[in-house]
Curated annotation (Swiss-Prot):
One of its GO terms (biological process) is DNA repair. One of its GO terms (molecular function) is ATP hydrolysis activity. Residues 1-185 are annotated as: Large ATPase domain (RuvB-L). Residues 259-342 are annotated as: Head domain (RuvB-H). This is Holliday junction branch migration complex subunit RuvB. Its EC number is 3.6.4.-.
Length: 342
């Protein structure tokens, strides 16, 4: 039987979260916390395009999930005074799906494609002339008698978001003049995000409570807000309605999020690499089978944090547990062979 992990520290949006995220989403560049260099650059690009009355160049936003790529797209549309059209790679199954979106765009509108690395090859190829020449090619008929009809499109901006830049085909990636990678947030930035969100939710919050939540939010705003919601529940039912350090600590212990921000699935991954595979190296598919999760989910959701925090290493031969993983789980490294990093 597959045991599903607790999902409170999963950086991907859960069902029903979109509405809350929209209510807490920053409305302007000045409201956006963190990613200072990226925001400063994009602010200049947007202002220049607006002054010239042109569409903004196509933008590719990459980085781990939950860091604010969608929020940046919304802010761009608002700053440019245009409409944002939102879709995702998996939703664009055939060329007709893309055609319907492109032909509905007004001049300078933004088309936001989340998970753009998951576009089908046919849709991706149809996107090339749309991005370069603002046209969409429609094939009429089949075989030798087939003809291509060009549909002219309004000049628009494509904003693509991806967590897996390496899965993007080079011809697609190279068609984005503006490419920015979002990085994990520091504790001070996450604290500010938590305090702002608590204020919007009408939740009194202590400084040390916000600091503790930020410290254990895996560098990800979406996780910080999710944990804030759960802490609000505990503060309301088992406390005096105020978010204190004690309330946050009690909440996260109940959610099995430890002092370093690792959850039950993180610990299962590390335990599998150490106990089942002798510390590695071991392939991602083997680890996924051992913990009962899809390998893509491990690569997108869990591994980036474990690698960044020094618990796990990705090597040409597979995943290897690092000394911090042994120490965190209380394992003796002499109990099994330690894999080579080369």
């Amino acid at each position: 039987m597959t045991v599903k992990p607790l999902r409170d520290v999963t950086p991907k949006p859960l069902e029903g979260e979109e509405r809350l995220e929209q209510s807490l989403r920053p409305a302007t560049f000045d409201d956006y916390v963190g990613q200072v260099k990226i925001v400063d650059n994009v602010k200049v690009y947007a202002a220049a395009a607006r002054q010239r009355g042109e569409s903004l160049d196509h933008v590719l936003l990459s980085g781990p999930p939950g860091l604010g790529k969608t929020s940046l797209a919304h802010i761009l549309a608002r700053e440019l005074g245009v409409t944002l059209h939102v879709t995702s790679g998996p939703a664009l199954v055939k060329k007709g799906d893309l055609a319907g979106l492109l032909t509905a765009l007004a001049p300078r509108d933004i088309l936001f494609i989340d998970e753009i690395h998951r576009l089908s090859p046919a849709v991706e190829e149809a996107l090339y002339p749309a991005m370069e020449d603002y046209r969409f090619d429609v094939v009429l008929g089949a075989g030798l008698g087939a003809q291509t009809m060009e549909m002219k499109l309004e000049r628009f901006t494509l904003v693509g978001a991806t967590t897996r830049t390496g899965l993007l085909a080079s011809p697609l990636r190279d068609r984005f003049p503006i490419q920015e990678r979002l990085e994990y947030y520091g504790p001070a930035e996450l604290k500010e995000i938590a305090v702002r969100a608590a204020r919007k939710l009408g939740l009194p919050v202590d400084e040390d409570g916000a600091e503790e939540l930020a410290r254990r939010a895996r560098g990800t705003p979406r996780i910080a807000i999710r944990l804030l919601q759960r802490a609000r529940d505990f503060a309301q039912v088992e406390g005096d309605g105020r978010l204190t350090r004690e309330v946050v600590d009690r909440t996260l212990r109940r959610l099995e999020v430890d002092a370093r921000g690792l959850d039950a699935m993180d610990r299962r991954i590390l335990a599998a690499v150490i106990d089942t595979f002798g510390g590695g190296p071991v392939g991602i598919d083997a680890v996924a089978a051992a913990v009962g999760e899809e390998s893509g989910t491990l690569e997108d959701v869990y591994e980036p944090f474990l690698v960044r925090e020094g618990y796990l290493a990705r090597t040409p031969r597979g995943r290897v547990a690092l000394p911090a993983a042994y120490a965190h789980l209380g394992r003796d490294r002499s109990g099994g062979k330690q894999g080579s990093l080369v």
